[in-house]
């Protein structure tokens, strides 16, 4: 009886000891979890990834290494400069305040550490398989196919099947939409002076560098100029020095923004820069009017499809030339909107922002099937 009675009196102390040990184990696990969570929240660099200072446009494409430990920032490699011409780059946070930065460089030595590689199609299309980044691809690295050229200027797309994760182009259905231009609201009062009609001393201009006699735009021009004088600039025509281009075009009331290729969303600097930045009313030949109106109000431009013939268009332009009120109606949109044009630096920052928002890893099965 005594041994059993003694055991009963010792049992509560054993239960207390077991409870204390259990609480100690829970506390150790909890504080270990807090430490891991805090480390994750600070964004410690992934092992093997060196932070590289953003390129500020150094012609050699090299980047200075920052030895100060920093929060991991996405590293984007430009496999080539666009058309093999170095361009000035800017901090993405400066281009759009409140956004995050990426490290962007054209230094191929960082290829093994790069989170993404932007491949400009024109620079690799002559022999894609030999000009693409090497295999094996670093784990998790995303490749971005980039082109601002229309399908006829993008050869050998079929050779790229299964290589790319994201598309980046002027097409609005691209993963990364990089148009040639756009309209955006004024942040305050319009910052431009009213249009000076007295400075518009000429009627119609057209600047063309790629003259193809059998193209749709040349055929239309030839029919139009039979009824209306058009000043043509470019190769084999009137010289137009780059330094005086906008000054020259701003003297004209109308500008022929004729695209060299007719494809959806292919609306280039011919409209956004040559016409709108010169304060000339664009006369457009390209995709349908409805396609233009996805990016512009209906009144800033004149579409050739609105007329039965080039002769009818010529007559309309001559009428507007004499009717100042009707001509000025093509500028009302400027009271609330302003035109913007693309830059390579901004396009690369758009890729930066997309990569930060979209972590899903996908594969584009066929660039050719989508783009052509």
Curated annotation (Swiss-Prot):
Annotated catalysed reactions: a beta-D-galactosyl-(1->3)-N-acetyl-beta-D-glucosaminyl derivative + GDP-beta-L-fucose = a beta-D-galactosyl-(1->3)-[alpha-L-fucosyl-(1->4)]-N-acetyl-beta-D-glucosaminyl derivative + GDP + H(+); an N-acetyl-alpha-neuraminyl-(2->3)-beta-D-galactosyl-(1->4)-N-acetyl-beta-D-glucosaminyl derivative + GDP-beta-L-fucose = an alpha-Neu5Ac-(2->3)-beta-D-Gal-(1->4)-[alpha-L-Fuc-(1->3)]-beta-D-GlcNAc derivative + GDP + H(+); a beta-D-galactosyl-(1->4)-N-acetyl-beta-D-glucosaminyl derivative + GDP-beta-L-fucose = a beta-D-galactosyl-(1->4)-[alpha-L-fucosyl-(1->3)]-N-acetyl-beta-D-glucosaminyl derivative + GDP + H(+); an alpha-Neu5Ac-(2->3)-beta-D-Gal-(1->4)-beta-D-GlcNAc-(1->3)-beta-D-Gal-(1->4)-[alpha-L-Fuc-(1->3)]-beta-D-GlcNAc derivative + GDP-beta-L-fucose = an alpha-Neu5Ac-(2->3)-beta-D-Gal-(1->4)-[alpha-L-Fuc-(1->3)]-beta-D-GlcNAc-(1->3)-beta-D-Gal-(1->4)-[alpha-L-Fuc-(1->3)]-beta-D-GlcNAc derivative + GDP + H(+)
InterPro entries: Glyco_tran_10_C, Glyco_tran_10_N, Glyco_trans_10, GT10-like_C_sf
Domain of life, per lineage: Eukaryota
Coiled coil: none
Modifications the protein undergoes after translation, according to the UniProt entry: Glycosylated.
Entry membrane topology: Single-pass type II membrane protein
Protein's pathway: Protein modification; protein glycosylation
Annotated stretches, region: Disordered: 40-68
Cytoplasmic side: 1-15
Transmembrane segments: 16-34
UniProt record, GO biological process: fucosylation; lipid metabolic process; oligosaccharide metabolic process; positive regulation of cell-cell adhesion; protein N-linked glycosylation; protein O-linked glycosylation; regulation of cell migration; regulation of cell population proliferation
Residue ranges, Lumenal side: 35-372
EC number, as in UniProt: 2.4.1.65, 2.4.1.152, 2.4.1.-
Keyword Metal-binding attributed: no
Subcellular location: Golgi apparatus, Golgi stack membrane
Family, as annotated: Belongs to the glycosyltransferase 10 family.
Function, in words: Catalyzes the transfer of L-fucose, from a guanosine diphosphate-beta-L-fucose, to both the subterminal N-acetyl glucosamine (GlcNAc) of type 1 chain (beta-D-Gal-(1->3)-beta-D-GlcNAc) glycolipids and oligosaccharides via an alpha(1,4) linkage, and the subterminal glucose (Glc) or GlcNAc of type 2 chain (beta-D-Gal-(1->4)-beta-D-GlcNAc) oligosaccharides via an alpha(1,3) linkage, independently of the presence of terminal alpha-L-fucosyl-(1,2) moieties on the terminal galactose of these acceptors and participates in the blood groups Lewis determination and expression of Lewis a (Le(a)), lewis b (Le(b)), Lewis x/SSEA-1 (Le(x)) and lewis y (Le(y)) antigens.
Protein name per its UniProtKB record: 3-galactosyl-N-acetylglucosaminide 4-alpha-L-fucosyltransferase FUT3
Organism from which the protein derives: Pongo pygmaeus
The encoding gene: FUT3
